[in-house]
Amino acid sequence: MATNKSIKSVVICVLILGLVLEQVQVEAKSCCKNTTGRNCYNACRFAGGSRPVCATACGCKIISGPTCPRDYPKLNLLPESGEPNATEYCTIGCRTSVCDNMDNVSRGQEMKFDMGLCSNACARFCNDGEVIQSVEA
C-alpha cells in the first residue's frame, strides 16, 4: 500500500509541475552595457517611457530570450539580485511547496526516493531543463 501512495505522490508532483510549466510565459527583458545604462533605463521606465524608447535612449537592448548578449551584461539593477539567486529561490520554493507536502504524507525508504525525484524535478524546472543530480543520489 505504501508503494501506491508513493506512486500517487510522484504523479501528483509531476502533474503540478506540468501545470506550472504551462503557465510560464516568456517576457521581453532589457540588457544594458553597464550600471549607468541600467539606472537610466529603470528611471525612464519609472517615468512612463516605453521599453523601446527607454532602451534606445539609454543604450540598452530588448531581448526575448533568457540571456543577455556578452556586450550587454547588466540584466539587474543590483549585482546580488542576479539569475543564480533567482534560480536558488525558485528551487527552494518549489521544494518547500511541493516536495515538503509529499514528505508529510508518509515516511519510509520509498518516500526518501520520491523526495529525491521531486527535488530533481524542481531543480530541472527552475534551471530551464538542465539536469542537476541530487546530493542524496
From Swiss-Prot:
Chief location bin: secreted
Entry-linked SUPFAM superfamilies: Crambin-like
Disulphide bridges, residue numbers: C31-C68, C32-C60, C40-C58, C44-C54
Record carries keyword Magnesium: no
Record GO biological process: defense response
Alphabetized InterPro entries for the sequence: Thionin (IPR001010), Thionin-like_sf (IPR036391)
Location(s), subcellular: Secreted
Chain positions listed as propeptide in the UniProt record: 75-137
Keyword annotations from UniProtKB, A to Z: Disulfide bond, Plant defense, Secreted, Signal, Toxin
UniProt function note: Thionins are small plant proteins which are toxic to animal cells. They seem to exert their toxic effect at the level of the cell membrane. Their precise function is not known.
PANTHER family: THIONIN-2.1-RELATED
Name the UniProt record assigns to this protein: Leaf-specific thionin
Gene assigned in the entry: THI1.5
